[in-house]
Amino acid sequence: MSKFIVIEGLEGAGKSTAIKNVLATLAKHGITSPVTTREPGGTPLAEKMRELVKQGHPDEPLTDMAELLLLYAARAQLVGNVIKPALAKGEWVVGDRHDLSSQAYQGGGRGFDRDLMMTMRNTVLGDFKPDLTIYMDIDPKLGLQRASARGELDRIEQMKLDFFERSRERYLEFANSDESIITIDAGQDLETVTQSIITALEAWLVNNGY
């Protein structure tokens, strides 16, 4: 039976490395070549929306509401045209971000009303949600240091520290109240983080009969 696994976290949390570990662990269990996605993005139209969200436009500021709507428009394209069809064919899907990012960044960071965020989620996704979310938790200050070391920061990465502190609070709020979310301490050394991800995913796979 197909499953949808998502990796979440703030900037610099190590999501890319986590995804590699997830893919390697799945392969050991005979789950090879899962569909991989990223949000925003993952389809031709959604990638154009990603560019707007990440880079903005030099002649016009992107409003917070426009950003929110672009993110959900991109998500609707990805879920409808890629994720759901793949799952229907029995394929596994591994995603770099999903709706929890919007709940954290737009709901927590931007401060959008909780009811609005739930309405957006329910309208676009209904009862569709990941089977497992691996949340890479990191102190925002350390995460931004790591992100800065990678090179030029995009529009979101340039937000001030308090934005990411609010986003982290919302991430943790969801993680602490949803059994389908596993929290990994991403502030540890790489070897420890890697082993934590593998151990958690192995346990989840065994519990689900894989």
Curated annotation (Swiss-Prot):
Keyword Nuclease in annotation: no
A Pfam entry, by short name: Thymidylate_kin
Enzyme superclass (EC): transferase
GO MF term set: ATP binding; dTMP kinase activity
Enzyme Commission code: 2.7.4.9
Record keywords: ATP-binding, Kinase, Nucleotide biosynthesis, Nucleotide-binding, Transferase
Record-linked InterPro entries: P-loop_NTPase, Thymidylate_kin-like_dom, Thymidylate_kin_CS, Thymidylate_kinase
Gene Ontology cellular component terms for the protein in this record: cytosol
Disulfide bonds: none
Ligand binding (ATP): G9, L10, E11, G12, A13, G14, K15, S16
Gene Ontology annotations of biological process type: dTDP biosynthetic process; dTTP biosynthetic process; dUDP biosynthetic process
Family to which the UniProt record says this protein belongs: Belongs to the thymidylate kinase family.
Role this protein plays: Phosphorylation of dTMP to form dTDP in both de novo and salvage pathways of dTTP synthesis.
Protein name listed in UniProt: Thymidylate kinase
